[in-house]
Curated annotation (Swiss-Prot):
Protein name per its UniProtKB record: Uncharacterized MscS family protein AF_1546
Cellular localization per UniProt: Cell membrane
Any one GO molecular function term: mechanosensitive monoatomic ion channel activity
Segments traversing the membrane: 18-38, 61-81, 94-114
Length: 283
């Protein structure tokens, strides 16, 4: 036992002993094992959610990050004093820290977005006022192609902390019309026509069932509310097609959409007419 202790306490150089070297080797071996376990589990979890090149890049950053942290932790055991280096690089470290803060935040947010998958490529979304199609979800940013054909790059930190509206996440989406008809028109007939048009459209869903009803009596019209469900991918086309068909079919059946109307009554005009009649009688 005494010989073993002497061997462990044997100084190789300076104050560094054999025991210190063994500690360094064990720590680095454990760090390597931990890094491999973490990256392996992440690869299994994200292999179907990320592009292969992006996934491999992220795993390498994590792997070598763990190794570097472990290596820095064992440097004092090798007799290396980092205090001078830290002081000399303090200002540089602060500058790099501020510069890399947003990069790290975007990287972490990107990992969470890819894991949670609130959006995917091809989805129609609205993120912080930017509406369009998701073109790509990268590690640091998300690319949106707007309806005008513009490409907008949004940092993942902003995407992750913003309210995300995904228009196609649900299989079906509802839209609504308010159709006004004249008071002289038959509201029941108008409802029957609208229901028939909806039933004839191949993409107007039967379940949930469309709803057509008189909602209120307006100043110039009887207002009929029409609520229809359609597949999210066909929602816009169905909405535009049915709106035009409802208009044309109602007009064919003599049911018109009235213009706003106002009845204006002038008290002075009535008084002037009465006075004019009296003057003519006296003459």
């Amino acid at each position: 036992m005494g010989i073993m202790i002497d061997v462990l306490n044997y100084k190789l150089y300076g104050d560094v002993t054999v025991y210190d070297i063994i500690v360094v080797i064990v720590v680095m071996a454990l760090a390597t094992i931990i890094a491999k376990l973490i990256t392996t589990n992440l690869r299994r979890a994200l292999i179907d959610k990320m592009k292969r090149d992006q996934l491999e890049l992220m795993l390498k950053v994590i792997y070598f990050g763990i190794i570097i942290v472990a290596f820095i932790a064992v440097l004092p055991a090798l007799g290396l004093d980092l205090s001078g280096l830290l002081v000399a690089g303090g200002i540089t470290g602060i500058v790099l820290g501020f510069a890399s803060q947003s990069v790290v935040a975007n990287l972490v947010s990107g990992i969470f977005l890819i894991s949670e998958k609130p959006i995917k490529i091809g989805d129609q979304v609205n993120i912080d006022g930017v509406a369009g199609f998701v073109e790509d979800v990268n590690i640091l940013s998300t690319i949106i192609r707007t309806y005008d054909g513009l490409y907008v790059r949004i940092p993942n930190e902003k995407v992750f902390t913003s309210n995300i509206t995904n228009y196609v996440a649900h299989i079906a989406r509802r839209f609504e019309y308010v159709v006004g008809i004249r008071y002289s028109d038959d509201a029941e007939k108008a409802i029957e026509i609208i229901k028939r048009i909806i039933e004839e459209h191949p993409f107007a869903l039967k379940n949930p069932e469309p709803v057509v009803f008189v909602d209120n009596l307006g100043d110039s019209s009887v207002n009929i509310v029409v609520r229809i469900w359609a597949p999210s991918t066909e929602w816009y086309n169905v909405k535009m097609e049915l709106l035009w068909k409802i208009k044309t079919e109602l007009e064919k059946n003599g049911i018109e959409i009235p213009f706003p109307q106002r009845v204006v009554w002038f008290a002075n005009e009535l008084r002037a007419n009465v006075e004019g009649k009296e003057e003519r009688r006296q003459a």
